Amino acid sequence: MRLVVVAAALTGFLATPAFVSTQTQPAPSASLAPPPDAPPPHPVAPGPYAVSVISEPTLTTHTVYRPTDLSPFTAGQRLPIVAWGNGACSNAGLLFETFLTHIAGHGFLVIASGPKDAPLPAFASRVPGQARSQPDPNAGIAAGSTKDEDLIKAIDWAIAENGKSGSAYAGRLDPQKVAVMGQSCGGLQATAVAGDPRIKTVVIWNSGVFNEPNGGRGATLSGARKESLAKFHAPVAYFLGGPTDLAYANGKNDFSRLTTVPAFLGSIHSGHGGTYMHPGGGWFGEVGVAWLKWRLNGDQSAAKYFEGADCILCTDPIWEVAKKKIK
């Protein structure tokens, strides 16, 4: 049976989704390998725009994903800005290439922390479904890893380029449509900077602030604390990987603490590695585009994924859903 929870404040919520076995589940894990009983890959068609993945000379610390042809993006249809923080606070701009390329192909400027030419970390793999092992995410930030401020740096750069005469982006970006997103440690980074007044939506992927007092082990990864949640001022979405996702309990706990902003929680049994490496980013690619189109562009077709008791994710048995201040 499907359960959709709509409430102002929840603790200990969300029943076991229909697709999860009632037998003993594996313990939550940082492994990026999908659970053995995960739903099959969900290929997603690309967006209407060809995408270029580039290193900009004025922002070599980041990797830019954007439509190759910027000419369609003028007054009335400017590109929204999306700043992205990598899992493991990795300083590698191509770590989520499949997923971020899909987002950009739907008409978004995506700026990922980390240089384009940086080597991928040892745990990374671009092969869908291949088991991957991730270092302990509580081990601290290694030298050269990204920081919370890198997301703000990305936003600052994009807005400056939009107003710079002679820039390829001049007049083609929309400073009123800014999102910040991140996976795992990158989700902590997004949480830490969510109070920036320019941000119009926050998307947290496989992440949540550690439940220990004062941030516990999470304190070594980011400046995010439970107190950071009080600074949220824009709609937020949490997308988690089910009970085997290391961040599942933390993400649900963060969601339970939100009382002032529209919030959506969607979880699919995919583990901590989500579906980012599936074609088009799989389910995460599809729902990520839908959330951004709705919250940044006002796309009411995209809103159908999230709004109403009969929303697309609400009625799909592989999704576990909770909502606050969203009809």
Where do the model's predicted regions map?
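Bacterial N-terminal signal peptides
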Residues: 5-17
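Signal peptide processing junction and immediate N-terminal pro/mature segment
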Residues: 17-25
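N-terminal cap/lid segment of alpha/beta-hydrolase-fold proteins
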Residues: 25-77
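Serine-hydrolase catalytic machinery in alpha/beta-hydrolase-like enzymes
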Residues: 55-173
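Loop/turn elements at helix/coil->beta-strand transitions in domains of secreted/extracellular proteins
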Residues: 77-81, 106-111, 175-177, 197-202, ...
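Primarily recognizes the serine-hydrolase "nucleophile elbow" in alpha/beta-hydrolase
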Residues: 154-231
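The feature captures the conserved acid-bearing segment of alpha/beta-hydrolase catalytic domains
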Residues: 200-278
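Alpha/beta-hydrolase-fold serine-hydrolase catalytic core, especially in secreted/extracellular enzymes
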Residues: 270-273, 278-327
